[in-house]
Amino acid sequence: MDARVSWKQNLSFTGTAESGYELPLSAKADVGGDEDGFRPMELMAISLVGCTAMDVISILRKKRQDVTAFDVNVNVERADEHPKVFTSAVLEYEVVGRQVSETALVRAIELSAVRCCPAQAMLGKIMPIAHEYVIYEDEGDGRRREVVRGRYEYC
């Protein structure tokens, strides 16, 4: 894989990769940035949730789960001192659907964590990554009811 960033001004860049899409990168104003793009560490967090989200929804669809909405959130803790690396992460999978199986969701999370997601594989070598989930029953008209909440643990 090849990627590139091109400097625009101050601490603003445009990133590109083999896919051909452009992505704005920037920094906080207090360090000289224009705040007109993603910060690099934000992109690492988005890469983690994006990678596992694609795995999990693909697996749930293959298992014929009736998912009507799906979000993955991540909370990443960082070191206090520079270079302020990631020290831990908690992924939370929010699934809305009709009779979504907890067993199917846990298996999808497990496959993503241990087999499919290169972002988790890399970041998991340097920090703990916890996995939490919640399943909501889609009751129509934008209404949903929490069915189950849990945590997936792996070594």
Predicted regions and their residues:
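Extended beta-strand/beta-hairpin segments
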Residues: 1-46, 57-155
